[in-house]
């Protein structure tokens, strides 16, 4: 199998694992060398920057087994099959923080492009309202909702109290935006 991508020739790909994620090994030319790289295929995801009318951001704190720590994060989650990014953002906002609101697309980025296919779509959620029917959290989630001033959230990013990269990117982006939210 030869596939030409961005002036790179992919010689082959083989699946190493398949479950909630897939791990594959791609073999390709890099200049005159043949390189093999393991790639995680992960569904795309959404991140929500939920701001209330008092200048607070709604964050979540949850234990993350991979880090063996509780992290402070923006509400986020994977896009399920058949969902648009906006549908997923509405669902995740309801599940994780119990709110609905107006969603505005902000930006997209790859989270770990050196080895992972996941792209995250970020949304601003404004005009927040308590959800009439709150969805159940995922079975691996135990979430505490935190509402703090956006300026305090930025300070927590700078001081190292917030260490989740998607959250740092989102808070930095919204804090440095010239648009009045």
Give the positions of each predicted feature.
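Unchanged
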Residues: 46-47, 79-165
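Long hydrophobic alpha-helical segments typical of transmembrane helices together
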Residues: 161-181
């Amino acid at each position: 199998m030869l596939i030409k991508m961005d002036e790179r020739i992919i010689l082959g790909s083989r699946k190493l694992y398949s479950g909630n994620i897939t791990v594959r090994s791609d073999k390709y030319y890099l200049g005159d060398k043949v390189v093999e790289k393991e790639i995680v295929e992960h569904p795309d995801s959404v991140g929500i920057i939920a701001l209330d009318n008092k200048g607070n951001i709604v964050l979540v704190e949850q234990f993350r087994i991979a880090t063996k720590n509780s992290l402070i994060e923006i509400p986020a989650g994977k896009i399920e099959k058949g969902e648009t990014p906006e549908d997923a953002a509405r669902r995740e906002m309801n599940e994780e923080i119990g709110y609905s609101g107006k969603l505005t697309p902000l930006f997209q980025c790859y989270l770990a492009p050196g080895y992972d296919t996941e792209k995250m779509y970020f949304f601003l959620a404004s005009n927040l309202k308590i959800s009439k029917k709150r969805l159940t959290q995922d079975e691996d989630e135990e979430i505490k909702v935190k509402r703090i001033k956006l300026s305090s959230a930025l300070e927590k990013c700078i001081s190292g109290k917030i260490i989740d990269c998607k959250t740092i990117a989102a808070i930095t982006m919204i804090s440095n935006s010239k648009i009045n939210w």
